[in-house]
């Protein structure tokens, strides 16, 4: 039976977002939500017919909130809003981000506080399920009042306007609708505002980054465990009784992950057998990786709330009361997404330092730059440079966006979140750090193959090594390879969910204890 996810505004999970955004799983509006949506819409219709003054329904927007709009102009008001607010810049957001945006907006609207018609929500749902993906530029949102510019781009194809992607083609909005067999709509009172006023874009991008960060945290433990085996690392820093007396959850989880990955390894040692202590990048993995785990677990808890929240304005209450408030403001997610970027950046930083230890012959006791006949061959020399470049770029990107604000809309919107910038930066940091971790895994596998002794790997690291070696070969001589091809293969391997799934079938990995 084909899987379909019900949207009720209450129970959407991060895993559901991934399934719909990346795996194309279909979704539908849960029957339980229909009554609330219809009741909310009736209140808006009554507001228009009674000529009541309500922001965004019978008034202008932003600093024009005191301009009254006649009932006969309320429909034109909404279309004008979409046409003028679609003013983004930059490259288009990727397909998975666009699908996540559409999904999260639908899930917010079905809670029944936005006064939008059920048929309008169903139209956005139809685009999502049929794979019509609006062209949404990545830049142009202040994260308050919501993600106005990018969400307006999302709405344009619903009206037969704008641009959209359909089955690999970049088309006009109307062409995309025609090819998908979808009729365009006209917006009714308040509907344009209901569709674009909210934190949906920053939440969608941040949600995808959060999910990927959770996977990266596990991969970083794997990379660190492989590096530890290269160096015949001391295992006592991962003993549980060390961490129970400082019971930070991420620290405990990291230590357990490392123990599980290294179970049965013959490439480790005990303190005083050959040395007393390992360097921080190996010995302190529970404390370093664990801190990022705790940070990202916190961010996930915020994402779980936001993807099931109403971030519209004004809010149409069940009793007919209308509240003009600030739920569109992105600050509650801007700060966590800045935090997310910092946490991921640290994973890239420490991984790059372990790459340096692997390629440095004085530290690894292996051939310089992990290649036979160094001098004639340069091996992983510039690979470490590239990782250092990414790590340093991350340090710049990790500067928080949420500490900045520029007043807008004639100073009516005088303090904004920059949350969408925070989310986009976090995703860029994620991509950089994932490249570094992939390189560490590649370098560690190369180093293990160069070790004079060939001892059994750990229960988890052996699975990872074997899978990795099916796609990325040992580098014998420079003349046989173009190393960027191998680096790209390494990234492709670890980004494939099946790689981590196979390791987790062998050993348990988690981010919280």
Curated annotation (Swiss-Prot):
Cross-link 5-imidazolinone (Ala-Gly), where in sequence: 144-146
Q: Which UniProt keywords apply?
A: Cytoplasm, Histidine metabolism, Lyase
GO BP annotation list: L-histidine catabolic process to glutamate and formamide; L-histidine catabolic process to glutamate and formate
Cell location: Cytoplasm
In the record, 2,3-didehydroalanine (Ser) modifications are located at 145
Q: How is it modified after translation?
A: Contains an active site 4-methylidene-imidazol-5-one (MIO), which is formed autocatalytically by cyclization and dehydration of residues Ala-Ser-Gly.
E.C. number(s) listed in UniProt: 4.3.1.3
Q: Name one GO molecular function term.
A: histidine ammonia-lyase activity
What reaction does this catalyse?
L-histidine = trans-urocanate + NH4(+)
Pathway membership, UniProt: Amino-acid degradation; L-histidine degradation into L-glutamate; N-formimidoyl-L-glutamate from L-histidine: step 1/3
**Keyword Lyase carried by entry:** yes
For this chain, the family text in UniProt reads:
Belongs to the PAL/histidase family.
What is this protein called in UniProt?
Answer: Histidine ammonia-lyase
Q: Native species of this protein?
A: Streptococcus pyogenes serotype M5 (strain Manfredo)
């Amino acid at each position: 039976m084909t899987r379909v996810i019900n949207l009720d505004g209450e129970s959407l999970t991060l895993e559901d977002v991934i399934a719909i955004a990346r795996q194309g799983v279909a979704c539908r509006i849960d029957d339980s939500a229909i009554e609330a949506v219809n009741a909310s819409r009736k209140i808006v219709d009554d507001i228009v017919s009674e000529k009541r003054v309500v922001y965004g329904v019978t008034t202008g927007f932003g600093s024009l909130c005191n301009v009254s709009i006649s009932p006969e102009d309320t429909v034109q008001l909404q279309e004008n809003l979409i046409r003028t607010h679609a003013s983004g810049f930059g490259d288009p957001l990727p397909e998975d981000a666009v699908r996540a945006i559409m999904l999260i907006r639908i899930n917010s609207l079905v809670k029944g506080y936005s006064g939008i018609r059920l048929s309008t929500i169903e139209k956005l749902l139809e685009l999502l399920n049929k794979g019509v993906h609006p062209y949404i530029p990545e830049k142009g949102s202040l994260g308050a009042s919501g993600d106005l510019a990018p969400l307006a781009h999302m709405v344009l194809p619903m009206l037969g306007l704008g641009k959209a992607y359909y089955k690999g083609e970049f088309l006009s909005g109307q062409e995309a609708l025609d090819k998908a067999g979808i009729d365009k709509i006209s917006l009714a009172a308040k509907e344009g505002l209901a569709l674009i006023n909210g934190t949906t874009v920053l939440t969608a991008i941040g949600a995808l980054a959060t999910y990927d960060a959770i996977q990266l945290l596990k991969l970083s433990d794997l990379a660190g465990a492989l590096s530890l085996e290269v160096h015949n690392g001391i295992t006592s820093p991962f003993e549980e009784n060390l961490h129970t007396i400082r019971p930070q959850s991420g620290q405990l989880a990291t230590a357990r992950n490392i123990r599980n990955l290294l179970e049965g390894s013959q490439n480790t040692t005990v303190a005083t057998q050959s040395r007393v202590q390992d360097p921080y990048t190996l010995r302190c993995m529970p404390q370093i990786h664990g801190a990022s785990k705790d940070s990202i677990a916190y961010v996930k808890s915020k994402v779980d709330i936001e993807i099931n929240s109403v971030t519209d304005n004004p809010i149409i209450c069940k009793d007919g009361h209308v509240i003009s408030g600030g739920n569109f403001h992105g600050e509650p997610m801007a700060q966590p997404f800045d935090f997310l970027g910092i946490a991921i950046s640290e994973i890239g930083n420490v991984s790059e330092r372990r790459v340096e230890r692997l390629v440095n012959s004085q530290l690894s006791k292996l051939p310089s730059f992990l290649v036979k006949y160094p001098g004639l061959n340069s091996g992983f020399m510039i690979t470490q440079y590239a990782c250092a470049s990414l790590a340093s770029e991350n340090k710049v990107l990790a500067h928080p966006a949420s500490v900045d604000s520029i007043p807008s809309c004639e100073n009516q919107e005088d303090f904004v979140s920059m949350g969408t910038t925070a989310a986009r930066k976090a995703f860029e940091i994620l991509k950089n750090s994932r490249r570094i971790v992939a390189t560490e895994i590649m370098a560690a596998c190369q180093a293990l193959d160069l070790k004079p002794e060939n001892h059994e790997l750990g229960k988890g690291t052996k699975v990872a090594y074997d899978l990795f070696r099916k796609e990325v070969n040992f580098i014998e001589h420079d003349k046989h390879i173009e190393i960027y091809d191998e680096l790209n293969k390494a990234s492709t391997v670890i980004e494939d969910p099946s790689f981590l799934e196979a390791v987790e079938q062998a050993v348990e990995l988690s981010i919280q204890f």
